[in-house]
Amino acid sequence: MSENLTELRAEFVYNAARLQAIATQAPIVPVEWKDRESPFKEQFLKVIERQCGEYSELQRSKSPEELHGSWMQAYFNMGWVYGEKYDREKRIHPDLVPFALLPREERDKDAVFIALCEIARQWILLPAGGY
């Protein structure tokens, strides 16, 4: 899969998930994609490659629970820790808990993320001539 295709899909999924957070007045609304730090973008591109890539059927998370577990591991690997109040600078996140302990809105957000990845996988394609 082209890196450009992965980037297109990543931006689509990220921005759509961000809009969902805004629309539902979520307690944490991600900053714009352009403002995300490089380690986050790198791990997010890996998630999108796994969820949407050519061989994604064998690798992708198929349930919100599975996706959340992968997300937690990625955040722990980037040095984030659990804390009740979100702090991007200190890498503290209240959602670093088992899926069953998440508020309903956060569990729903993971289900929407899987749906957005499926939309990106099926509908975001490179033009015939590429970029």
What are these regions (language model features)?
Residues 1-131:
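Alpha-helical propensity feature that highlights long, continuous alpha-helices across diverse contexts
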